[in-house]
Amino acid sequence: MIKWRKWNNILHRDIGYTITMLTLVYGISGIAVNHTADWNPNYQLQKESFSLEPVKGTATPEMKQNVMSQLNLKDEPKSVFRPDPETIQLFYQGRTYTVDIPTGKGIIEHVRPRSVLFEFNQLHLNTPKKAWTWFADAYAASLIIVAITGLFVLKGKNGITGRGAFFSIVGVVIPAVYWIWYQYL
Amino acid sequence: MRASILLFTFLFIAHAALAGDGKQYGKELTVKEVTKISDILAKPEIYNGKRILVEGNIVDVCKERGCWIKIASDKDFESLVFKVDDGVITFPLDAKGKKAHGEGVLSVKTFTKEQLIESGKKHAEKEKQEFDPASIKGPKTVIQLKGEGAVID
């Protein structure tokens, strides 16, 4: 009895256990970031409208003070911007106030990172770069090992020469047919 | 219980690794001298194709992919779009209001009325919005910095 299958199964099992968490991270994030046209997978965005008196002042600092006073904001904003002569924006951590100067009508935009998903997406998309690039490479190599060793875990009719062959071929045909359809038809 | 502890430990480490100010995005900055955005917008042809460094507060971020930020000029009513290739850099949506230094190559392109209408139609179709071709009055010059690296305070 050759021992390669024993070591194959040990590798498959132990690497499999090790990468379970990261596989969940990449899988969940993968679904989330596949649909960026429909939602923002990293942040929750909420907009609320409000109405003030027309903003008083001639220069930006006066207008900023007037808006802060009307909204009862005690803290100084991180920054202020005038995108056009009739609009003033006040930026705070996680929220932006945009006010139409002549009418006083405005919108507060709240931005909050989505719990758990934000971290998952940052790791999946390798936002941190640096050391995480190496971890991600090691994870990808581990996935390749788990995939290949997985083919040879079982022998007999449920192994790669029987049932396993059928499902492995299905796994090749689906992306191949899709690619031919996408590229040439 | 153990699984919960593991999950929270993992999230804590990930959050700690991802948090912090003065973050570097993309390549390291190499240009030392800052060019004023107001100077660029006043005479864009001088800077077209040149590598430059700009600074200013972030006043908008791409909501879908974080693939651009808008940096406020040193003068009112002006800003410059700092655009990166999708996936190369992902700017956080909560960077609004923070100060940024961005380095890249300035691109100045003039689009004809027909090109703008075509692109407007495609954008509206993608975003499932209405588009009125009459809203395009004539050709438009688009000035943006093809971003390669940025530091956000």
Where are these predicted regions, by residue range?
Chain B
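Sec-dependent N-terminal signal peptides
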Residues: 4-13
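OB-fold and OB-like single-stranded nucleic-acid-recognition modules
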Residues: 19-153
